[in-house]
């Protein structure tokens, strides 16, 4: 019987999840809360804050949803999956205890240390003075300072000198830029090498990695400017060879799942591994307890299997018997952002070039809505820092990148900002073999 599904969140990632779920024959009525303007073309939207666990769970119970996909990190960390389970509604995503793998950097670093999972050397602190004493004593730059808790993907500072480190410590620990997330910090060594994002499905027993991807975090071309939630992605990541994939499975993926089980908090859902391929081998930079944004916008378009079946298998512990297959092709996503993002930007700018939220007549192009709204007169307008993600799929990455940019040119709004070099590093790596 077709399932009535609720997706919790309201960005490009959630839009990509909804579009993939809708391909499943078991997917019936689909809702998104809070959703956004562009998502409302694909799902019914209900304006409930993703972090309002009580209201969301009451809504899910009242509407009798068969399955809930909790796609955003904050509600997972707040225990939304536990609260849904308490009223008998199955959900995709880790419970509160397992979500700590992302919600607390201290927890995840200590987990890796205890179970021998390769990661950067680190120390944890709750006293700002001691942080600076340690950094001065080490005398090694750049140094990485991370807020312990969730910080919208912006709680990681790479400091080139003592002054930057002191400013960073003040910002996180004293000025409380990220609130209680900055009560503790992790200080770690700066690693070098290509970065790889690997999202994986897990039921707490087996891990089935998705196709690898490459994110572009900085706001401007040539990886300059401020860190953002991500300005574009490509998949697969050419640096992630079959040999490296096998090494990661043996030394990182399975050991992480076993470690969580040993700690009494088995992880079910999407576990995202942020990896760096260092001269000493792959190391974990970060874990996320959910799909990445905008990685999801290139990974799920390449999924050939039934996403709803895979998700329910993760929830039910039957992933070993469930097919997870990706196409051999490639995908590229270019983010169209509001000028001034990630600092100050205006909202409410009319968007032109789209029909019902999509580019008309483009077979292999999908527009995912991150921050859009529909006004009372039906105009699609900007409503966030990252506005749209334009994804192209093609047999080869070169074509995917070219087509994503060609499609992006057809969309416009005032003060639109995009990077012009998404995928160039990956294409260079392919060219160099």
Regions found by a protein language model. Name each.
Residues 249-271, 288-362, 375:
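Active-site "cap" helix and flanking loop/linker of ATP-utilizing ligase/carboxylase catalytic domains
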Residues 155-296:
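Internal nucleotide-binding/catalytic subdomain
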Residues 1-96:
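ATP-binding N-terminal substructure of ATP-dependent carboxylate-amine bond-forming enzymes
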Residues 372-376, 381-433:
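Generic C-terminus detector
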Residues 46-52, 123-127, 159:
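Short acidic-hydrophobic, aromatic-tinged amphipathic segments that line or gate anion-handling sites
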Residues 23, 38-40, 62, 92, ...:
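Solvent-exposed alpha-helices and their adjacent loops that cap or buttress functional pockets
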Residues 92-155:
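A conserved helix-loop-beta module that forms one wall/lid of the active-site cleft
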């Amino acid at each position: 019987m077709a399932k009535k599904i609720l997706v919790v969140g309201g960005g490009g990632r959630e839009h990509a999840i909804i579009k993939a779920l809708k391909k499943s024959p078991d997917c019936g009525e689909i809702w998104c809360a809070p959703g956004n303007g562009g998502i409302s073309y694909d799902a019914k939207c209900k304006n409930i804050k993703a972090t309002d666990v009580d209201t969301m769970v009451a809504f899910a119970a009242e509407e009798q949803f068969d399955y809930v996909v909790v796609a955003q990190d904050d509600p997972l960390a707040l225990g939304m999956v536990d609260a849904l389970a308490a009223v008998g509604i199955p959900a995709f995503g880790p419970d509160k205890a397992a979500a700590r793998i992302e919600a607390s950097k201290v927890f995840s670093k200590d987990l890796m240390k205890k179970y021998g999972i390769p990661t950067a050397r680190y120390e944890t602190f709750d006293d700002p003075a001691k942080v600076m004493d340690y950094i001065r004593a080490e005398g090694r730059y750049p140094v990485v300072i991370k807020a312990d808790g969730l910080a919208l993907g912006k709680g990681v500072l790479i400091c080139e000198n003592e002054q930057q480190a002191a400013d960073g410590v003040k910002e996180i620990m004293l000025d409380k830029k990220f609130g209680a997330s900055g009560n503790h910090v992790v200080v770690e060594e700066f690693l070098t090498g290509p970065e790889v994002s690997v999202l994986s499905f897990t039921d707490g027993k087996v891990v089935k990695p998705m196709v690898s991807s490459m994110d572009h975090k900085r706001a401007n071309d040539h990886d300059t400017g401020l860190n953002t939630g991500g300005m574009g992605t490509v998949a697969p990541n050419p640096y992630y060879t079959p040999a490296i994939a096998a090494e990661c499975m043996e030394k990182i993926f399975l050991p992480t799942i076993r470690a969580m089980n040993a700690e009494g908090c088995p992880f079910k859902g999407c576990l995202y591994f942020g990896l760096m391929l260092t001269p000493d081998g792959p190391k974990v930079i970060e874990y996320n307890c959910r799909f990445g944004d905008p990685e999801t916008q290139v990974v799920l378009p390449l999924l050939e299997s039934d996403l709803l079946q895979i998700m329910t298998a993760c929830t039910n512990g039957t992933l070993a018997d469930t097919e997870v297959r990706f196409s051999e092709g490639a995908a590229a996503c270019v983010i169209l952002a509001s000028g001034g993002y990630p600092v100050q930007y205006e909202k409410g700018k009319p968007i032109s070039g789209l029909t019902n939220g999509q580019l008309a007549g483009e077979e292999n192009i999908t527009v995912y809505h991150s921050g859009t709204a529909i006004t009372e007169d039906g105009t699609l307008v900007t409503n966030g820092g990252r506005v749209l993600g334009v994804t192209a799929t093609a047999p080869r990455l070169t074509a995917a990148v070219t087509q994503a940019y060609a499609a992006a040119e057809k969309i416009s709004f005032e003060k639109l900002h995009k990077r012009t070099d998404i995928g160039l590093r990956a294409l260079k790596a392919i060219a160099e073999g």
